[in-house]
């Protein structure tokens, strides 16, 4: 009977131990942090597809002396462009395009490739089917400067088909927006690579 009493007492003690107020502090693990996605970033978006601003510094060809800055801003499917440039002939008109390759290393800027054209459209003005890189021609004022703003529709700064990482080129002559594939804008007199800001 003594064995039965001892066994009963051991069972009560064991049950009482299980009914304590919780595990000892050494047995508690701290919570493991779980990363959560930022509410404004979709899992399929990249840094570049969310780009809202970009800049290209125009450097001159060996013979032009033209310098400038091109500031791009916007989101969605339109981009605002602000171009400032100096060193041009007063009253001259210049073709202006985004080119396919972000490289202005060659002296004639041919390293920038052809016009940026991810949609494989013909060259043309903004109110007709055109390359994504086709932009309005620019007019230099009487002091040989350009300071102009315009908006491009149907293009983006970032993403696979965005402007960032490509080159912007100012040409010696006006773009006729007719001749294929580039509008006969002449020599490339200034070039800059478009970088996200």
Please describe what each predicted stretch is:
Residues 14-17:
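C-terminal motif of bacterial Sec signal peptides marking the signal peptidase cleavage site
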Residues 1-8:
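Bacterial N-terminal signal peptides that target proteins for export
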Residues 19-197:
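N-terminal leader/targeting pre-sequences
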